[in-house]
Amino acid sequence: MTKALETVGLAKSFGALQVTRDVHLSLEAGARHALIGPNGAGKTTLVNLMSGALAPDQGQVLLSGADVTGLSQARRVKQGLARTYQINQLFRDLTVLENVVISVSERLGASWNLWRRASARAEVIDEAVVIRGQLQLDDH
């Protein structure tokens, strides 16, 4: 079975400080995982390496079996690999669906484009409705 996300031999140093070394990680689709450890253990660095915010010194990041190591963070987002930060907030004045539409729009590269075609808007809304249903979120 293809893993949703894998790292193979991932390593990153900042000067003489080796933050990650030979990290092998396999994450199954739909499973929940926790990355825990003390401050300074390299958790954020590992997430930044996987998301493309940092380039590894060695190793690979695989998304559904495809090597995305050389892709920018923006390209990884378009392929479905994105990260959230510890402090994340929804737009409180928007509905659940409207919040999901913003996220889907960003991933599809359709955000904040007033001149995009109507069918692209419909595609974004349709996908957002599906995601909202999968997550069993009610609108308010």
Predicted regions and their residues:
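Short coil-to-beta microelement around the adenine-binding A-loop and adjacent beta1/P-loop entry
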Residues: L17-Q18, R75
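ABC ATPase NBD Q-loop/coupling interface
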Residues: Q60-Q79, W115-R121
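Short coil-to-helix segment of the ABC ATPase nucleotide-binding domain corresponding to the Q-loop/switch region
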Residues: L94-A110
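Conserved ABC ATPase "signature" region
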Residues: W112-H140
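Short beta-strand immediately N-terminal to the Walker A/P-loop
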Residues: H33-A34, R83
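Helix-to-loop junction immediately C-terminal to a conserved catalytic motif
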Residues: S51
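The feature captures the beta-strand-to-loop junction immediately N-terminal to the Walker
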Residues: I36-P38
